A protein has these predicted regions:
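Short secondary-structure transition hinges
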Residues: 89, 96-126, 158, 162, ...
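Amphipathic C-terminal alpha-helical segment
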Residues: 100, 150-168, 182-191
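Amphipathic alpha-helical packing segments from all-alpha helical-bundle domains
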Residues: 110-136, 143-147, 174-185
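Alpha-helical structural segments
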Residues: 11-18, 22, 53-72, 82, ...
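N-terminal intrinsically disordered/low-complexity leader segments
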Residues: 1-7, 190-191
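Hydrophobic alpha-helical connector segments
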Residues: 57, 70-97, 139, 145-149
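Helix-turn-helix
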Residues: 11, 19-53, 57
């Protein structure tokens, strides 16, 4: 009779995610995770074929953390602006997860930037819908606006996650609003 599984796959992923939150993806080793679980590395390999499989699950779990930040932002009175603020807040509160998701070399680089957001952002369509609902833009223009603001807010978030500069909330809102309004004015003016 095989030994009873003491730790579920989900519990291991949750503990691994916490380890990565605290110390970064490089700290996610079988030994470190086993120590956190109070077990031996053998327990991990009873649930996962190898560490690459576990790391892939941790990345999915980290993506769900971002999705939750964006979901909450989309409930705000000014959802699109709040999405930009949320990404910077995520970088501030979860710098290791931000670096894992957005600052590591990709195994599968994207060839055209316009493909990036639809592929990487689980809330892409919801964000586009919020832009079209709040601004006099077409879906195509909303996609371009989101692309521009993503690049801008990603730069700010990268500065925050790497510890270069910690933007204040008023500063973030002011900068994002100014850029967003300028882009919308430019797009609407071309019609």
């Amino acid at each position: 009779m095989p030994p009873k599984v003491k730790f579920s796959k989900e519990a291991m992923i949750g503990t691994a995610l916490q380890l990565v939150r605290e110390e970064g993806i490089a700290s996610l080793t079988a030994r470190a995770l086993a120590e956190k679980l109070g077990a031996t590395p053998r327990v991990i390999f009873g649930q996962f074929t190898n560490m690459a499989e576990l790391q892939a699950e941790v990345i999915v779990a980290a993506e769900m953390v971002v999705v939750e930040y964006i979901r909450k932002a989309l409930e705000d009175e000014k959802p699109f602006r709040s999405v930009g603020v949320a990404s910077i807040l995520f970088a501030s509160k979860e710098p290791q997860l931000f670096q894992l998701l957005f600052q590591n070399p990709s195994k599968d680089p994207i060839r055209r930037f316009q493909d990036f957001l639809p592929m990487k952002d689980h809330s892409y369509q919801l964000v586009l819908d919020s832009i079209v609902a709040d601004y006099p833009l077409t879906v195509e223009e909303a996609g371009r606006l989101y692309q521009h603001l993503f690049i801008y807010s990603h730069g700010m978030a990268s500065m925050v996650a790497s510890g270069i500069y910690q933007f204040g909330m008023e500063e973030v809102i002011g900068l994002l609003t100014e850029v967003c309004q300028s882009l919308i004015k430019e797009m609407v003016g071309k019609k």
